[in-house]
């Protein structure tokens, strides 16, 4: 019977680079001929991925499955937590909404069910794959939470997985973070840590080497590698990553793409393809004073559309967006929650998001939205009609609500139905389809249309985003193989399987 060899990546904090390293190892193992699966027992994220059977998992595990060349399933992320408001989140179990819970309720009442779900998924994956790349969350040294944690050392024990601890040197204090984390671990868990990887390094490695030697002597734990800072086009999962994005226009780029950053922004990976375009400056906007006059304004998805509409009002963005449409030639695009905001009204008769019955939208699209208790999660494809051209597009939908188009024209023709809406002048468009901009032909047409409006020649050579993503997986794997002792990690994986737990 097949029995997967597991390896687990844990970090000193969120956004240390666990997801990226897990993705790299999924690619490395797959390239070496091993059938490989990613696993994250519990993921807290507003960036989702829809599986082939219409289930919802964390974006990172979907991307890691792509890197491994396997079909993503809910066993790769059996529990997904989607924050919807302060101290409350939607709990998604095996890709379907389970219940909205307060943080305290989840901790006190979900623990035993969570353990059972995790054990079941581990059993399935361990018996179907050769390698299992497990990702932790946050830090394993959260001493106030460890008695009922479901995602770090408890999972390592359940899978009998060796652990690699990841530290982010870019933030500073990496040795303090690594040493402090190791010291706060229980002795049995500390023995699982086979080494550390220092991530996001910039500069002269020789200046770091005395610190590496000191760390190994002080802790007895091996430094398995120092990974340089990498600019890779692979989806960010954690909203912490948003802090790295620009808030000001790059004047060297011809097209100014502004993205509204509201508190409950979700699936912001929708805009990733614009970062690959040579003439696009992408910036995030969170107040009226920084809106300016962009060429393209994107209202992305939201986990709580009504609360984020109030955010637009409180920050002055609501009226500024309306004035922007009236006074400029901007193209506005709403995706999912952003599409709902562009409409006339968002009704919430079942109080899915807030105690309010309804809220007024921006009234830039002739639609009305009614939120519902049942969530739609589906892969979709169809024909998009825009500026007298037709484009085959595919993506996915994740939403709780339906939008009725009162007038105007649909944007996308699906099999037996339509999706989205556009104004007659096609300056405002909206859709429930995530990954819309991942469709190269439409994205290229949109951007070259903006160039023509600005009396600039269109660019005939633009990137194929899916090819770039595939290349990014290989570039990432190449970089990690160069800078990390992969063979030492594989040896420890085999030793743990045999029950040999001695030091490196």
From Swiss-Prot:
Keyword Glycoprotein listed = no
Q: Which PROSITE patterns match?
A: GATASE_COBBQ (PS51274)
Q: Does the keyword ATP-binding apply?
A: no
Name the active site residues. 336 (nucleophile), 434
Alphabetical GO biological process terms: cobalamin biosynthetic process
What InterPro entries does this protein's entry cite? Class_I_gatase-like, CobQ/CobB/MinD/ParA_Nub-bd_dom, CobQ_GATase1, CobQ_N, CobQ_synth, GATase_3, P-loop_NTPase
What keywords are assigned to this protein?
Cobalamin biosynthesis, Glutamine amidotransferase
Question: GATase cobBQ-type domain: from which residue to which, for each copy?
Answer: 254-442
Q: In which pathway does it act?
A: Cofactor biosynthesis; adenosylcobalamin biosynthesis
Supply the Gene3D superfamilies for this chain: 3.40.50.880, P-loop containing nucleotide triphosphate hydrolases
This entry's Gene Ontology molecular function terms read: ABC-type vitamin B12 transporter activity; catalytic activity
Coiled-coil annotation reads none
What is the role of the protein in this entry?
Catalyzes amidations at positions B, D, E, and G on adenosylcobyrinic A,C-diamide. NH(2) groups are provided by glutamine, and one molecule of ATP is hydrogenolyzed for each amidation.
Q: Family per UniProt?
A: Belongs to the CobB/CobQ family. CobQ subfamily.
Q: What is this protein called?
A: Cobyric acid synthase
């Amino acid at each position: 019977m097949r029995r997967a060899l597991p390896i687990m990546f844990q970090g000193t904090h969120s956004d240390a680079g666990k997801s990226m390293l897990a993705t790299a190892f999924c690619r490395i193992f797959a390239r070496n001929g091993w059938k490989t699966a990613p696993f994250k027992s519990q993921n807290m994220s507003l960036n989702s991925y829809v599986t082939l059977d219409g289930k919802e998992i964390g974006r990172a595990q979907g991307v890691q499955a792509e890197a491994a060349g396997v079909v993503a399933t809910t066993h790769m992320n059996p529990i997904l937590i989607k924050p919807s408001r302060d101290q409350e989140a939607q709990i998604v179990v095996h890709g379907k909404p389970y219940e909205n819970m307060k943080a305290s309720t989840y901790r006190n009442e979900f623990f035993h069910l969570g353990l059972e779900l995790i054990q079941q998924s581990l059993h399935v994956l361990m018996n179907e794959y050769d390698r299992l790349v497990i990702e932790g969350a946050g830090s394993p040294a959260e001493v106030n939470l460890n008695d009922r944690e479901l995602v770090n050392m408890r999972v390592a024990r359940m899978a009998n997985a060796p652990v690699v601890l990841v530290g982010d040197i870019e933030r500073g204090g990496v040795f303090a973070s690594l040493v402090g984390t190791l010291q706060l671990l229980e002795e049995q868990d500390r023995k699982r840590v086979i080494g550390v990887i220092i991530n996001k390094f910039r500069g002269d490695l020789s200046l770091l080497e005395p610190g590496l030697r000191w760390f190994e002597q002080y802790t007895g734990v091996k430094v398995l590698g120092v990974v340089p800072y990498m600019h890779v086009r692979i989806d960010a999962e954690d909203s912490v990553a948003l802090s790295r994005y620009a808030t000001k226009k790059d004047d060297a780029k011809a097209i100014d793409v502004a993205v509204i950053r509201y508190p409950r922004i979700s699936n912001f990976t929708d805009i990733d393809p614009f970062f690959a375009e040579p003439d696009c400056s992408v910036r995030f906007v969170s107040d009226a004073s920084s809106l300016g006059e962009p060429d393209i304004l994107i209202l992305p998805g939201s986990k709580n559309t009504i609360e984020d509409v109030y955010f637009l009002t409180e920050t002055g963005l609501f009226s500024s967006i309306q004035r922007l449409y009236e006074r400029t030639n901007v193209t506005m695009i709403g995706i999912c929650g952003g599409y709902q905001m562009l409409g006339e009204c968002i009704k919430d008769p079942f109080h899915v998001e807030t105690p309010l019955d309804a809220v007024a939208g921006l009234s830039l699209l002739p639609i009305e939205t009614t939120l519902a208790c049942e969530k739609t999660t589906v892969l979709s494809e169809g024909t998009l009609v825009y500026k007298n051209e037709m484009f085959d597009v595919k993506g996915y939908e994740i939403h709780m609500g339906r939008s009725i188009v009162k007038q105007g024209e649909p944007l996308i023709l699906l099999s037996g139905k339509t999706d989205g809406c556009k104004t007659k002048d096609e300056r405002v468009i909206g859709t429930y389809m995530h990954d819309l901009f991942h469709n190269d032909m439409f994205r290229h047409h949109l951007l070259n249309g903006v160039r023509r409006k600005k009396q600039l020649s269109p660019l005939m050579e633009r990137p194929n985003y899916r090819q770039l993503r595939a290349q990014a997986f290989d570039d990432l794997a190449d970089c990690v193989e160069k800078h990390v002792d992969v063979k030492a990690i594989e040896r420890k994986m085999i030793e743990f399987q045999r029950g040999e737990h001695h030091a490196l």
